[in-house]
Curated annotation (Swiss-Prot):
This is Cytochrome P450 2J2. Heme binds at residue 448. The lineage of its organism: Eukaryota, Metazoa, Chordata, Craniata, Vertebrata. SUPFAM superfamilies: Cytochrome P450. InterPro entries: Cyt_P450, Cyt_P450_CS, Cyt_P450_E_grp-I, Cyt_P450_E_grp-I_CYP2J-like, Cyt_P450_sf, Cytochrome_P450_fam2.
């Protein structure tokens, strides 16, 4: 009898046990996920979330900056999103953005380190570092940039020289259709190369071209849905093939390139004669030898150099590409820019920032390109450093903060014609007018440290190109303002005709 009952129990257990175990495991995981993601009291509202994934499939990563505007309309100027384990809050509107990034900047000063960023950079570099390490790296880099000409005539002359190389390269196209992408990338990148590596590269240099292509590819890949899925399930995705593996491989190659440049510098390094950023950093590292807590170490040198290289190339070159595209699409605006250049500079003199004050229209056009180009649409993310209250909502420590620059730069209460390319937004009585709602370089203590360099580059490169060429659409080709979503928003691949000025 007992044997029969035992056999029956064993048979029932064999049938029930796997299912019960599976259901119990799923129920436990769902309960754990629910408790983990339970919103605290007064947390900003947001859309309904799926277990484990959060709002991942509600976001179209090909146009995420536009998708979130629908949530703004539904949930207001402070709303939340969950992307896997990442809790994010989007801030919209000038008053709230200023409150967070200026008046409460000490509470929003860190950078969030996603699983993808952790894999690539950990907490090193200039862009994604936080706390004392970030303060030390930023202070050192600003000093180094000033020592190598930032804000001085020497660096401006370097930009003018590179602008000549760029105009010569474009002149070789003989007015025929060409894609300006990598010619512009070459020129802009050479400025930061001269600062970091102490040398510029020829536009035909195959090694340099490969470097720029790797940089372009990581810019695009990092914002893709597959790569973002790595941030949700890193422990699974790291074993699977896909674009995220290409991304990691490309960053590894870029790091090897910088390591090679550092090794070259070490061979003939003279502490008494600092040639460039790498030399300056090696000198600073030598002061902290034997200090395990110092932020000045080789991995930070590699990551900081890559940050300078990326930020110093991608943002400015993308803005210039938008500028030429807008000029080809708005020939009447291009003519006004050229008329101002002819009047103030002429054809025989090289453009310089000394002429900027006398060229309000050209300056306004550059600013309008930045507004409409909107290349960093949700700003570089911040992270809440301590439990904080903003606009009556509770933001726990560790929450990712995104600032809605897309809505700000298209706000109808701030701009007369928000969806139209209109340089008059930056003009008043014929003079250039600064706008508080314009912040392509962000604001506060974590604003872009290369803003001054970028403004100089944009003005000199743009005016040099407008001085020498008229940009037009190729015959039988229609230009559009369609964009490619990546870390930045860039124009889709297109061709232009650069007709030399007579």
């Amino acid at each position: 009898m007992l044997a029969a009952m035992g056999s029956l129990a064993a048979a029932l257990w064999a049938v029930v046990h796997p299912r019960t175990l599976l259901l119990g495991t799923v129920a436990f995981l769902l309960a754990a996920d629910f408790l983990k993601r339970r919103r605290p009291k007064n947390y900003p509202p947001g859309p309904w979330r799926l277990p484990f994934l959060g709002n991942f499939f509600l976001v179209d990563f090909e146009q995420s900056h536009l998708e979130v505007q629908l949530f703004v309309k539904k949930y207001g100027n402070l709303f939340s999103l969950e992307l896997g384990d990442i809790s994010a809050v989007l801030i919209t509107g000038l008053p709230l953005i200023k409150e967070a990034l200026i008046h409460m900047d000490q509470n929003f000063g860190n950078r969030p380190v996603t699983p993808m960023r952790e894999h690539i950079f950990k907490k090193n570099g200039l862009i994604m570092s936080s706390g004392q390490a970030w303060k030390e790296q930023r202070r050192f880099t600003l000093t180094a940039l000033r020592n190598f000409g930032l804000g001085k005539k020497s660096l401006e002359e370097r930009i003018q020289e590179e602008a000549q190389h760029l105009t010569e390269a474009i002149k070789e196209e003989n007015g025929q259709p060409f894609d300006p992408h990598f010619k512009i990338n070459n020129a802009v990148s050479n400025i930061i190369c001269s600062i970091t590596f102490g040398e510029r590269f020829e536009y035909q240099d195959s090694w340099f071209q490969q470097l720029l292509k790797l940089l372009d590819e990581v810019t695009y890949l990092e914002a893709s849905k597959t790569c973002q899925l790595y941030n949700v399930f890193p422990w699974i995705m790291k074993f699977l093939p896909g674009p995220h593996q290409t991304l990691f491989s490309n960053w590894k190659k870029l790091k090897l390139f910088v390591s090679h440049m550092i090794d070259k510098h070490r061979k003939d390094w003279n502490p008494a004669e600092t040639r460039d950023f790498i030399d300056a950093y090696l000198k600073e590292m030598s002061k902290h030898t034997g200090n395990p807590t110092s932020s000045f170490h080789e991995e930070n040198l590699i990551c900081s150099t890559l940050d300078l290289f990326f930020a110093g190339t991608e943002t400015t070159s993308t803005t210039l590409r938008w500028a030429l595209l807008y000029m080809a699409l708005y020939p009447e605006i291009q003519e006004k820019v050229q008329a101002e250049i002819d009047r103030v500079i002429g054809q025989g003199q090289q453009p310089s920032t000394a002429a900027r004050e006398s060229m309000p229209y050209t300056n306004a056009v550059i600013h309008e390109v930045q507004r409409m180009g909107n290349i960093i649409p949700l700003n570089v993310p911040r992270e809440v450093t301590v439990d904080t209250t903003l606009a009556g909502y509770h933001l726990p420590k560790g929450t990712m903060i995104l600032t809605n620059l897309t809505a700000l730069h298209r706000d109808p209460t701030e701009w007369a014609t928000p969806d139209t390319f209109n340089p008059d937004h930056f003009l008043e009585n014929g003079q250039f007018k600064k706008r508080e709602a314009f912040m392509p370089f962000s604001i506060g203590k974590r604003a872009c440290l290369g803003e001054q360099l970028a403004r100089t580059e944009l003005f000199i490169f743009f005016t040099s190109l407008m001085q020498k060429f008229t940009f037009r659409p190729p015959n039988n080709e229609k230009l559009s303002l369609k964009f490619r979503m990546g870390i930045t928003i860039s124009p889709v691949s297109h061709r232009l005709c650069a007709v030399p000025q007579v």
